[in-house]
Amino acid sequence: MSSEAVAQATAATTSPEHGVPTSSATPTPPPSKGGGAGGGGGGEQQQVPFQMIPPGHFFANPFLNPYIPTAGAPAQEGEAQPQMVFSPAQYQEVMHHYFQQMMAASGAQFPIPFPMQFQPALQQPRPSSQASSSHRSEDDNGRQTAGSVVSSNVSPNHREVRPAEDSTETSGVVQNNDELLVPTSTSSDVTIGDVIEKSDSPENSQESAGGEEKSEEKRKLSGDRTDSLIRKQMSEMEKEITRRSQNKNIKTIDDDGLAELIGGSSTRTVADDFSPFVDKSGLSYTAPAPPSTEKSAPKESLNQLRSSFNLPDDSTTVGPVGPSTVPQQSQQFANNSMFMANAGNFVQNAFPIGVTMTPQATFGAAPGFQMMQPHQHNLFMQQPNPTFVNNGTNPFLQTQATLPNFVQNGTAPLVPTVSAQQFTPEQLAAAFAQQQIAQSAAPTPFDSPPPSMPSTSSGPSGALAPPPPPSHPIPRRVSGNGWPEENKENGTSTSTTNGAQSVPAAAGTDDPVWVLRDSYLKKMQREQRTSEEEEMSWQEAATAAQEAAENGGGDDQEEQETDRLLNGGTTGASTKGAERRGSVDKKKNSKETMVHEPAVLIEGVLFRARYLGSTQMLCESRGSKAARMAQAQEAVARVKAPEGDVQPSTEIDLFISTEKIMVLNTDLQRISDTDVRQDILMDHALRTISYIADIGDLVVLMARRMSTSHSDESCSDGDSSGGGVRKTPKVICHVFESDEASFIAQSIGQAFQVAYVEFLRANGIDDPSYLRQIDYQEVLNSQELLGDELEMFAKKETQKEVVVPKKAGEPLGIVVVESGWGSMLPTVVLAHMNPVGPAAHSNKLNIGDQIININGISLVGLPLSAAQTQIKNMKTATAVRMTVVSTPPVVEVRIRRPDTKYQLGFSVQNGVICSLLRGGIAERGGIRVGHRIIEINGTSVVAVAHDRIVNMLATAVGEIHMKTMPTSMFRLLTGQEQPQYI
């Protein structure tokens, strides 16, 4: 290759705003290749691709390009253009001084020498046919003139250009040539190198001539550059910076010219069609455009060009080489130079917004071009993650930990199979040919499918290129439905060739990688936590049950539980039982919810219990609740083992439904493959159950003994079939032990209610709302007030006149509070008396007395503040006359609640009644707002927690006895408040 064949023509300058060429060049076919070997004498100085040592943070000059002469403003035809042309070595020297001066002006030191030092990876001599490796200039003092280093730091699309050298001089001078200057070869294909768009204008010829003269003069100088040359070049660079910043070289172009630029012949260069990467910093990748059915590509607008990375419609697209081109590519690889292209992790948006780099010819744009070979990539990438430029200026680029090595619009698979060692050119060519043959089966280093577009196909004009592969490989799945958006999200896409949809390339090449989904892992973790919580809850329940068995209450506690059960139905369950149920609330609550569903009770529910024993007793036909409770206690005393003895018991399942109650053996018997049964130990019809009681953890079930003389299982309390002497009815009492004793009793009561409703429906009454309305009205009518408070206020006998003597100006020495909303007569109540005051000395008043009037002024219905004002006004009197009704300070309330389905109608907070439902059960029973609950069913709740009080009220049924008093009075009597006497 002669030195005249290595010249570079001017390329179109790109506007930073539009990213489109501002000067057009007539596309011409590539020149015919002639000549055989490369430049004379250059083969002995060749070396194989080198390895770069990462220099750290390096800031490339974004304003100048070492190989493209900078053109001035558009001028008339025939006039010479101001230009500045120099060789790569000269450019490096100028940039070295430029950066030193720039860093010195800012008060810093330039951290690294310029140009960057490179370490040769291999020192193997190469034949003269491969004549594009690094050279050394005679006058560069041993520095490499690797222009591709600067070029690769300027733009990801900038390819390395190594000019062929003569035996006596470095051909860095641009010759006056009207043709596209490319490395020549004996092959008919274009050799590996940068294709520079030619220019036929005389201005470029004059620029080339001027550049040659400058270069020849420069080579004659010594190694030390004069200050005048540096000042001149710095002045030119400052002018270039000013011109670029002001955008004076923008040239308007119409649609026809734009179509001519992007629709040229297939052999023209495509450097103009790639706008700088700076303009793409804020754009997101989208799915490829659908294939066009028409052959002619439509004209594109500036907006489409601004957001497009693709090659023109009829340009040659880089892609994998087919099998038919493998020998040709192997020969071409052996006969042409190898060079680096876009190696290393390169930050795409490395330059400030608004600064435009001069685009270079796209690598691989010529027919038959191949991307960087795998062994070259491996040698160049020995240093892990070499990053050329840090993204410190672009605010639109997201921070990435590691960025991939990529070439847009498809690259050949890069397989790192060749290690860094000495290779001959023949070995490298053979390895390249073998890699090309195994290309289709070789996995890519990114675990992403290789491009499926062949090198001869053409994609639709204006289609967007796919996004670069991720830095960390992630398993992707391809949408089975072929939705483009889903494929875009998954990082996979399907390419089109001549309008036909192609199958993703990674479908059958790689083995599938199975990864557990996050949802499945979370599900396993939830199940594990649930099992651990259940195990802990059962352990806590077992511990609580054991402690309760060891610390069980005596006869007094059993009597309290018995009274509570008698008065409140299934209030049943002691406070210890409620605490034990707290650890297994989930299971208990589920069963409690089940018993409220009629359909569940019709089918039946199961409770696990321990059967302690049974006994038989005589009973009256219509015995009272107290008598039945006494019988239940007697049955427990008969069956339960004495203290200290081992209690014999058997695990059983208690089945409860609306028809019967059965005691089942827990051992399952398999009758067949589909029939598994339990032995029935006892079976009682629901109508034979006469009484159910829960005493702590014990459940007593009383069932009437059926007469053997009656086939209809009627009760034996009637006459016998012979009409003889009446027999005393007998009941059999079964004693069970269970932690769910209260729920068992409640379920049996619910079963009776559901059975009754079903009986009414069977007889034509099928309106549940009607039944509920009648039922609730009956419950309201059953409420009654204890003590006949209304009669106490109505009768004169219960009222008394009290005269309290005192001194003038002396207060009475009393504290009054409200009687509470819900009381029969809203007035004030005497809550406290000063022990040394006139009221206490009179011995006529008691705490709890309700004051009707004072000195003839009625206090009924007055607010508390108004009543207190009236009492204070009596301070000047020497005697005070009052009408009072003597009532105890504690109000007794009795509520009848047949079942838990009827709400009580009041709310409680920390034992204080906060609100009351008008017309409800509680109001009918005498509950008052503002009162403190003192006792529930004989159990003091003064020092009981709020949750326990609520549980006691929520589960209480039957007759509920409560004692309350005004909260203020309670706090005064207990010393929680200081009295303010009036």
UniProtKB/Swiss-Prot annotation:
Q: List where Polar residues composition bias occurs.
A: 1-16, 143-156, 169-190, 301-318, 490-501
What is known about its subunit structure? Interacts (via N-terminus) with egl-9 isoform e (via catalytic domain); the interaction regulates its trafficking; the interaction is direct. Interacts with rab-6.2 (in GTP-bound form).
Segments carrying the region annotation (Disordered) are 1-55, 119-228, 269-327, 432-511, 525-593
List UniProt keywords, sorted A-Z.
Cytoplasm, Developmental protein, Golgi apparatus, Hydroxylation, Membrane, Neurogenesis, Phosphoprotein, Repeat, Synapse, Transport
User: GO cellular component terms?
Assistant: cytoplasm; dendrite; dendritic spine; Golgi apparatus; Golgi cisterna membrane; Golgi trans cisterna; neuron projection; neuronal cell body
Q: Which tissues express it?
A: Expressed in vulval epithelial cells and neurons.
The record ties this protein, via CDD domains, to:
PDZ1_APBA1_3-like (cd06720), PDZ2_APBA1_3-like (cd06793), PTB_X11 (cd01208)
> What function does this protein fulfil?
Required specifically for the determination of 3 vulval precursor cell fates P5.p, P6.p and P7.p during late second and early third larval stages; required for basolateral localization of receptor tyrosine kinase let-23. Could have a general but redundant role in development, functioning in diverse cell lineages to control cell fates. Regulates the trafficking of the glr-1 subunit of AMPA-type glutamate receptors (AMPRs) in the ventral nerve cord. This may be partly through interacting with the small GTPase rab-6.2 in its active GTP-bound state.
Chain intervals with Gly residues compositional bias: 33-44
Domain-related comment: PDZ protein interaction domains may not be essential for function in vulval induction.
Q: Which part of the chain is the PDZ domain?
A: 801-886, 892-968
Q: Which residues form the PID domain?
A: 604-788
Q: Mainly localized where?
A: Golgi
Q: Where is the composition biased (Basic and acidic residues)?
A: 211-228, 577-593
The record's gene field reads: lin-10
Task: Tell me how this protein sits in the membrane.
Answer: Peripheral membrane protein
- Where in the sequence does UniProt note compositional bias of the Low complexity kind? 119-134, 432-445, 454-464, 539-550
Q: What the entry says about post-translational processing?
A: Phosphorylated on multiple Ser and Thr residues by cdk-5 which regulates its localization. May be hydroxylated by egl-9 isoform e on multiple Pro residues which may prevent phosphorylation by cdk-5.
Subcellular localization, per the record? Golgi apparatus, Golgi stack membrane; Golgi apparatus, trans-Golgi network membrane; Cytoplasm; Synapse
* Any GO molecular function: small GTPase binding
What the entry lists under InterPro entries is as follows: APP-Binding (IPR051230), PDZ (IPR001478), PDZ_sf (IPR036034), PH-like_dom_sf (IPR011993), PTB/PI_dom (IPR006020)
Q: What is this protein called?
A: Protein lin-10
